[in-house]
Each structure stands twice: as C-alpha cells, then as structure tokens.
Amino acid sequence: MASTELSLKRTLTDILEDELYHTNPGHSQFTSHYQNYHPNASITPYKLVNKNKENNTFTWNHSLQHQNESSAASIPPQQTYHFPIFNKYADPTLTTTTSFTTSEATANDRQINNVHLIPNEIKGASETPLQKTVNLKNIMKVSDPYVPTRNTFNYDVKISNDFFDNGDNLYGNDEEVLFYEDNYNPKMQWSLQDNSAAINNEDARAIFNNEFDSDDDDISDDEEDEIEENCLQQEQHQEEPLLSLDVTPISMFGSDQKTGRAKSSSHLFNEYSYVDSNMDSISSVVSEDLLDERGHEKIEDEDEDNDLDEDDIYDISLLKNRRKQSFVLNKNTIDFERFPSPSTSANVPSTATTGKRKPAKSSSNRSCVSNSNENGTLERIKKPTSAVVSSNASRRKLINYTKKHLSSHSSTNSNSKPSTASPSAHTSSSDGNNEIFTCQIMNLITNEPCGAQFSRSYDLTRHQNTIHAKRKIVFRCSECIKILGSEGYQKTFSRLDALTRHIKSKHEDLSLEQRQEVTKFAKANIGYVMG
C-alpha cells in the first residue's frame, strides 16, 4: 500500500499524544514506555534527522544516556525547529503558536522517534514535500499571542461610524436637511481614529454636547408663535355659546296680514319645506321681505335679525334630545293657518287616518299639519308698535309653535307603535319618550284585567305567553321539595331564570355543582298546568 494512503489514517489522538510529550520532528521517544510495542503500519513514516538512527531500538534505561551523547552537534537547533512534525494531510502548525527556545530545542533534539520505518517506505517518506507553515506568532505581530493586548493610549478614543458618510442619509424622516444650523460640528462624521491628536484630552460630555446642540433648536420662535395663535383661536371658537331660541331672528309674524291674504294659493305648496340641515332658508326669505317692506327700519335691527346666518351649528332638532325632522316655515305660513282655503282642507287628511304609521314621508307631514290645525296652536297677533317688540313676540310664538308641532309629531309616532298587537291584549300609554305596555288579559280567578305593566313590548309578549298561556310550563325546586315536602312541591316557577334567582336567594349555602343539579332536576321534571 502506498505511503500516501497510510498517512491518511493518522488520527488526532496521535497528534495530541505527540504534543503532550513534546515530540520534536524526526525523533522517537519512550520506546520502553510501551512494553509490548509493535510497529503500526498505519503510522506515516517521517523523514528522520539522523538517518543512522533509523533502525535503532533502545530501552528506556539507556535512551536518556543516548540523548546526552547524540547529534546535538551534527544538526543545529535552528534547523530542527523548521522540520515539520506531520505530513501535508494533517499539519496543525497553521494554528500553532509554540515557540522554542535554544534549550528546549536542544532537549527535544535528543529525543528518539518511536516510529520503526519499513525499508520500502523510506523512499516515499523522503519524497513527501515539506509544507510551508504559518505561525500565529508572525500573524498577530505580538511577542506572546496568549497575552491580551493592552491599551497603550493615554487619552479617550472617540467611537463613531460612517453613517453620515453616505449622501443618501442626509435627509431625515421629516424631509428636512440636517446640519443647516451654524453650529454644525463636522467632527461627528469622523471615523474611528485611535492615534488622532485632534481629539486628545477631550471630555466625552463636551464632545456629546457640541455634536447635538442643534437638537434644542428644532422648533423656531416663529413656529412656536404660530402654534400659540392656533391654540388661542381654537379656545375662542369653543367658548362661543350657541344661539338660544329666544334670539331667533324670525319676524314673520309682524308682517302685514293683508299681504298674506292677497297671496295666491300656489304658495301653499311651499308651506312646509322639510330639510335636514340648518335654518339658512328661513333667514334668507325673512331678510328679503324685510328689505322690501321695512326699509325704514334701523340697520341695528337688521344686524340682530341676521345673527342666525353666522351660526351653522344651530338646528331646530336641538329642541329634543334625539334628532327629528326639522322643517322651515315660510313667511305666509301663519296666514294660511288662520284662513285655510278649500284647497288646503282637501289636501290635509283627517286625523282618523293617523292611527297607523305611514311609511311615506308625505303622509307623516300631512298628519303634522292636521294636528296643528285642529289644536289651534296659533292665535291672532296684533301688530306691535315698534319693530323690536314685534320681533321678540314673533320669536316667542315661533318657539311655542315649533314645540307643539314636535310634540304632536312624537306623540303620533308613539301611539302608532302598539297598534301591531291586538287591542284586547294590551294597551299602551305614552309619558314623554317612555312608553308603558299594560296587559289587559282577564284573570280567570279574579275576573279582572291582569294590569301588569312593562316598558318593552317584548316583555309584555313573554308575559302573555307564559303567565296567560292555556298550557303553562312550570318548574319545581328540588331543595324546597326536600325541606318542605308537599308544600315545596306546590311552589312552582313559570320560567327557568326565575328558578335560578330563587336558588341564589333562598338557597345560598349550595355550591355551584349543587345548583346545577337543582337546575337539571327542574328540566327533567317539567310540569304542565292548564290555564
């Protein structure tokens, strides 16, 4: 077998063993250490330093004696240091940092290699080329690689990076150019300089403060002034109160009555204009009429009447808690209310049809008009002596008129809700926005109406389906039966949630599992009672 193939079988154990006993190239040692030593054919033959010692076999007793007499003078220690220990396939000298002194090299040179070469393999060993090794001692440029390098600088070292060296990073997130201030410090862009004299004996805090001075001036004085002005303007807008209904600038009632009578019936089509925004149309109509008919009035009164134009938040729907349909009254609305024409009465439906809720918006509008006509919410208004008195009186009349219209509209809607159920089953009464549903089913025992009241129609329906059902389902409490016997059996519950409340209140000492058992017993033993 070729010597190169044999050299592949040298293991790491052999290498560590040689290093442990300070083996030197070309020598064998500790022959007598292995009592029953036999040459290992797998060990790679090496080039010996002294070829006359190739086939020598020594015992441990006279090996040391031979070391004192051997070829220390024939080969100098410097030459033995450069001989390789291993072949090219397992050369650990690439990472070795062992340095030999003269005494160590002389002592190691006296050692004897314990490898017995086969004569046929000597030629192959001599032809194995020597590998060029790399020593960490030369790479690290230090006397001792295991001694950590010490900082020999007597001043602080500034650490930075090359972030600002890249031109793409000169813009921040707010699209503003960095370093536009006059106190820009270019030392921020310096790279790591260990031997730079420019930063010698500088304090780290001083460097930091000088580098980041511009951060304190991110917001200029002009921007601060603008922010303060905006805040003051917002506070002023928030502090402005909403115009109350007492100052509503509508003076339609103070106009001449003859003007309304002379108008044609075609204006009735525009009598009620339903909108969902503000009262701009009211103010525009009123302002035009005032300019035509009352040009002699003062400018102060006109400014007072036009205050509503400046407030878009105002809405008639603010009269109630919830938003309702707001409507606009034209100038001649009141005159047509006082003197209804035949066409008006023909277009307005009777109040008997308002019992049911109409899906169309026009029908609900007509019901509002009819209610206002029958109730007679408006009175004849005398013409005031002054414009100020007439405007105040007209505003009060408009408020009363609007409130009555809205209340009649809400009462009509509330009265139409319970019409879905049979009238004999229950009745409902409206108290403002709160509706009360009353059960009117006759009690067979007392021969009187039940009279149970509920705030929701759902509760009333559930009451009638359970209490007044012909065949009622009842639940019994097993704990009451155990304690009271027949009296506890007579105690029944129409709903399961009532039984649950009974268990929590009357049987507080029961655990959760025991309560579940009582509920299961009630479900399994449902009773029926004929009503």
Curated annotation (Swiss-Prot):
| One Gene Ontology biological process | negative regulation of transcription by RNA polymerase II
- What would you give as a GO molecular function for this chain, any one? DNA-binding transcription activator activity, RNA polymerase II-specific
> What GO terms fall under cellular component here?
cytoplasm; nucleus
Q: What happens when the gene is disrupted?
A: Mutants grow slowly at low temperatures and show partial mislocalization of nuclear antigens.
Record PTM: Ubiquitinated by UBR2 in the presence of UBC2; which leads to proteasomal degradation.
Residue numbers spanned by region Disordered: 338-432
Question: What Gene3D superfamilies does the record tag this protein with?
Answer: Classic Zinc Finger
Q: How does it assemble?
A: Probably interacts with SEC63. Interacts with MUB1, UBR2 and RPN2.
What does the protein in this record do? Acts as a transcriptional activator of a number of genes encoding proteasomal subunits. Binds to a PACE (proteasome-associated control element) DNA sequence 5'-GGTGGCAAA-3'. Its expression is in turn regulated by the 26S proteasome, thereby providing a negative feedback control mechanism. Required for normal growth at low temperatures.
Q: What is this protein called?
A: Protein RPN4
What is the organism field in this record? Answer: Saccharomyces cerevisiae (strain ATCC 204508 / S288c) (Baker's yeast)
Taxonomic classification: Eukaryota, Fungi, Dikarya, Ascomycota, Saccharomycotina
Gene designation per UniProt: RPN4
